[in-house]
């Protein structure tokens, strides 16, 4: 290892770096921003203000597709300690995916963050932003708290499948370094659209409160119990209410257990569980590692129009 450490680098670092600046807000407050109930939204902008350099966030298309956040430069007062979740003064805006530019330890990153369901407008905005970062050679940081893409007849008529495919296409084919942090839920196709393990992020970490799976335990239990009840009805067999409740509870317990981050990490579905306060340092380490490899040009596939 010492001999190899003396070898010169193959090429200069591929990612430019400026002098780093600490966040204006204490990263130690991150754990206090996590809700006790995982069904409650995370204050994503407040989380990012405790991770990025100088708490400076330049948001992309802030008023379009508001369920996907693209970062903006925010005034100090917006993210001050008076807005901590454990304070009665804290008011969280509606769930919104977010994209935009910031720096972490001097490295520029394009941040794609969400807090809820992806709609058609959110997916289109996300695809646009990912393409922009790929063209500029800017690394992508995905902050996941996603329950999936919106479903229903109205949203299907509006093209959620087509527009969601644009986001998935852009994420899959962007060759810039991609890092993913699961700070909340990571469920269904939203895991793919937000650069889950199958989409080859350089690193993927999970917070201790994170959950990952095809769907939540409560939803999975209800769906599987409904399927079993419908099957029994077609076959003309009995499926009592007690059997329905027992199957629903059994499936809920199983899905909840397998959604635990320890279950995922034990199977190498990610690169480890990290403390929220260590998120900035882990991202910086991932970016420094990625800077040692050349950034290949991106060749996007065919986007559905």
Map each language-model feature to its residues.
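Ligand-binding clefts of soluble mixed alpha/beta catalytic domains
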Residues: 1-305
């Amino acid at each position: 290892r010492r001999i190899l450490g003396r070898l010169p680098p193959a090429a200069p670092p591929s990612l430019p770096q400026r002098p780093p600046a600490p966040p204006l807000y204490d990263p130690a407050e991150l754990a206090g921003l996590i809700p006790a109930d995982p069904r409650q939204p995370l204050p994503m902008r407040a989380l990012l203000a405790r991770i990025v350099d100088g708490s400076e966030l330049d948001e992309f298309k802030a008023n379009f597709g508001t369920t996907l956040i693209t970062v903006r430069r925010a005034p100090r007062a917006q993210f001050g300690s008076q807005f901590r979740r454990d304070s009665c003064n804290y008011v969280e805006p509606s769930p919104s995916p977010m994209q935009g530019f910031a720096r972490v330890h001097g490295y520029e990153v394009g941040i794609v963050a969400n807090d809820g369901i992806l709609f058609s407008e959110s997916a289109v905005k996300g695809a646009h932003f990912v393409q922009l970062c790929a063209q500029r050679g800017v690394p992508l940081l995905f902050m996941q708290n996603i329950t999936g893409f919106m479903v229903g007849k109205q949203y299907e008529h509006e093209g959620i499948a087509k527009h969601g495919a644009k986001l998935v296409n852009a994420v899959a084919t962007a060759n810039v370094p991609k890092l993913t942090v699961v700070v909340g839920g990571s469920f269904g196709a939203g895991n793919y659209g937000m650069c889950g393990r199958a989409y080859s992020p350089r690193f993927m970490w999970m917070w201790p409160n994170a959950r990952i799976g095809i769907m939540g335990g409560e939803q999975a239990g209800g769906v599987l119990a409904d399927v079993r009840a419908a099957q029994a009805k077609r076959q003309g067999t009995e499926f009592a209410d007690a059997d329905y409740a027992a199957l629903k509870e059994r499936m809920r317990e199983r899905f909840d257990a397998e959604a635990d981050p320890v279950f995922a990490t034990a199977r190498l579905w990610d690169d480890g569980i990290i403390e929220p306060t260590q998120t900035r340092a882990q991202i910086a380490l991932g970016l420094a590692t990625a800077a040692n490899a050349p950034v290949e040009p991106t060749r996007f596939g065919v986007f559905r129009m």
